[in-house]
């Protein structure tokens, strides 16, 4: 599995602000989008381009253009919605596929409850977004679902990842790419990432 921890100063600064205990919903939501945008920039750096000729202001000019790769952004409900717009800033024509999976707070196991996926998944790059990679259960279940529908090319973007989740994800899906803003220390007994961000979904939606 390709693992990239994006260490750009802007990413580190913005993530540091998100860790503040008293951060308000508006600021947390804005920063989730901004870091999602920066992670997308990094994750799409290997997209193929081709030369095409267009009519410029002074006649024909040869330019680079993305080589017809279809993209779908896949937010995992509900917290993943907080990073979706960051992806769409760079790939505004991307289709949106939605997967609903929540974590049982007692067993920590993923429980699927909803899916609405783009067509032709086998032809698309799926960019899966979720702020936290904790145990990895929800992410693994989502990737299982996407692959069952024919998806072959997957990149995962998360704000914060725990070593335990990274290990589990690599064991289950070694062929995917994972981009994160930080690899944190560990999971606590409740399955939360330490130091982490707290409950990202509650902070994005203002329900904490």
From Swiss-Prot:
Binding site for 5-phospho-alpha-D-ribose 1-diphosphate: 78, 103, 130-138, 199
GO molecular-function terms, A-Z: GTP binding; magnesium ion binding; uracil phosphoribosyltransferase activity
InterPro entries: PRibTrfase_dom (IPR000836), PRTase-like (IPR029057), Upp_B (IPR034332), UPRTase/APRTase (IPR050054), Ura_phspho_trans (IPR005765)
Keywords (A to Z) from UniProt: Allosteric enzyme, Glycosyltransferase, GTP-binding, Magnesium, Nucleotide-binding, Transferase
Annotated binding of uracil, by residue: 193, 198-200
Cofactor: Mg(2+)
Species annotation: Haemophilus influenzae (strain ATCC 51907 / DSM 11121 / KW20 / Rd)
Lineage: Bacteria, Pseudomonadati, Pseudomonadota, Gammaproteobacteria, Pasteurellales
Protein name: Uracil phosphoribosyltransferase
The protein's annotated pathway: Pyrimidine metabolism; UMP biosynthesis via salvage pathway; UMP from uracil: step 1/1
SUPFAM superfamilies according to UniProt: PRTase-like
Coiled coil: none
